[in-house]
Amino acid sequence: MASNGMASSPSSFFPPNFLLHMAQQQAAPPHDPQEHHHHHHHGHHGHHHEQQQQQQHHHHLGPPPPPPPHPHNPFLPSSAQCPSLQEFRGMAPMLGKRPMSYGDGGGGGDEVNGGGEDELSDDGSQAGEKKRRLNVEQVRTLEKNFELGNKLEPERKMQLARALGLQPRQVAIWFQNRRARWKTKQLEKDYDALKRQLDAVKAENDALLNHNKKLQAEIVALKGREAASELINLNKETEASCSNRSENSSEINLDISRTPPPDAAALDTAPTAHHHHHGGGGGGGGGGGMIPFYTSIARPASGGGVDIDQLLHSSSGGAGGPKMEHHGGGGNVQAASVDTASFGNLLCGVDEPPPFWPWPDHQHFH
C-alpha cells in the first residue's frame, strides 16, 4: 500500500521523470567493457559522439535517479545499486530549492517562529525592532511621577502608559532603571557625606593629639621645675640650719669665755688667808682674827676637829650660816658666818678641784 501510494503520487524529493528514467535504465542491456575497448580502437570518433549525446540526455533529464527500492523495504535502496557521491552532489541543489513539507503541508515553520510570547528588550520593544527613544515630554512626565513616588502600582502604570502612548512594560522598565540610578546617586551622596565626616574627624583627632603632646611637654617641664625648686629649698634649709648651729656654738663659746668661774675669787683669797694665819698664830697664841671658812674646815684642832660631813649636816639643818669654833693653842677663834652663795660656790669648787689647790695641813703637822 505504501509502495503503490509512493508510485502513484510523485514526491517532491524526486524529479518529475524519475520513474520513467529508472525504467529505461533497467531495460537497457549491461555494458560490456570488451566491446567498449574494441569500439575505442576502431571507432573512437563515434564513441565520443555517443558520450556527447548521453551528456545532453542527462542534462535534459537532470541528475541520475537513486537506485530502486529494496524488495523487502521500499524506503531503503538496494545495496547492489547504490548511487555514487557525484550523483548525490547533483541532487543537493534541487533538494535545497524546494521547501520541506510533511503530511498535508501545514505551517510548522511559522508556528515555530511565530509561536510563544514576543521577546521584548529593556525598553519594552520587541527583539527585532529598534529601541524606541522617549521624547522630552514623556521623560518629564515620568520624572514628575517618579518624584511623587518611586514605586509603581499597576493602576498607575496603566494610566501613565495610556497618557504617554507607551506600553505598560516600557513604563515599568523605565521606573526600574530610574530607581537603580536613584539608588546609585544616593549611595554616592552618602559616601561623599561620610567621607567629609571622616576627614573632619581625622583632622580633629590630629589636632587633639598635637594638643596632648604639648600638654605632656608642659607637664614634664613643670615637674622638672618643681624638682629643681625643691632641691634649692632643701639646700637653703640645710645651709640655714648649719648657720644657726654655728651661730649658737659661737654664742655659747663667747658666753663661756666672758663669764669667769664662780670660785675664782675664793681661790684668790686662799693664799692670802694662809699667809695671815701662818704669820699671826705661830706659837698658838695669836689674836682672834677672821679666817676663811675652808681654811678653818681643813685645819685640825687640838681638842678635836670638825668633819666635813658634820659641816654639811649643820649647814643643811641651820637656817642661817653655820658658826664654827676653832680652838687654837692659846685662845678661841670664832669663825665668821658664811652665806649660802659662798657655800654653793665652795661646793662647786669641791666638785671640780683645781690642780693647784693648796692644802695647809702639812704646815700644822710640821
UniProtKB/Swiss-Prot annotation:
Cell location: Nucleus
Name of the molecule in the record: Homeobox-leucine zipper protein HOX21
GO biological process: positive regulation of DNA-templated transcription
Family membership noted in the UniProt record: Belongs to the HD-ZIP homeobox family. Class I subfamily.
The organism of origin for this protein: Oryza sativa subsp. japonica (Rice)
Tissue specificity of this protein: Expressed in seedlings, roots, stems, leaf blades and panicles.
Ranges of biased composition (kind: Polar residues): 240-252
Name of the gene: HOX21
Region (Disordered): 25-81, 94-132, 239-287, 312-336
InterPro entries (alphabetical): HD, HDZip_class_I_plant, Homeobox_CS, Homeodomain-like_sf, HTH_motif, Leu_zip_homeo
Function, in words: Probable transcription factor.
Main location class: nucleus
Ranges of compositional bias, category Basic residues: 36-48
Gene Ontology CC: nucleus
Biased composition (Pro residues): 62-74
Skewed-composition ranges (Gly residues): 103-115
Gene Ontology molecular function: DNA-binding transcription factor activity, RNA polymerase II-specific; sequence-specific DNA binding
UniProt cross-references to CDD domains, sorted A to Z: homeodomain
